[in-house]
Amino acid sequence: MIKIMFVCHGNICRSPMAEFVMKKIVADNKLTDKFLINSSATSTEEIGNGIHRGTKAKLTEMNIPFTSHHAVQITKDDYKNYDYIIAMDSMNLRNLQRIVGFDNEKKIHRLLEFTNYSRDVADPWYTGNFDVTYTDIDTVSYTHLRAHET
């Protein structure tokens, strides 16, 4: 089983969007039994809060099903238990190092390093642009799935 943890600052915008987009892609390809997909935060600011209304609206617009979700913070145990820890931006990478320590197993990646882009996924909490965030996540999720198909 391939275990993927998507990570952003608060776990209410980008990482839950990535979680539910990837779950839909996996389900559409009948691979649900081969993947475990979750999301978490690097900060404690939003712990317990639900998905941001803009993320919900974008997922709904794109017919991406989502379930009840409450923000959680990533832990050292998550590092041990997941194959991929996928951060949305450079600040998330730095905060992940602070939380889980050195990435000896090369599990931690920035989302867009799976593409030809070397930029961060813009945070719609600040930009208000959930469309750009969705496009980045959707493209990379398909790319990541194709790399792991058997």
Please report, for each region that a protein language model flagged, where it lies by residue.
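Conserved active-site segments centered on acidic
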Residues: M1-K80
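A non-catalytic, amphipathic alpha-helix used as a structural packing/dimerization or gating element
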Residues: V132-Y142
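Conserved small/polar residues in nucleotide/adenosyl-binding loops
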Residues: T143-T150
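Glycine/proline-rich loop-helix segments at beta-alpha junctions forming the active-site rim
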Residues: V72-D131
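Residue-level recognition of oxygen-bearing side chains
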Residues: M17, M91, T150
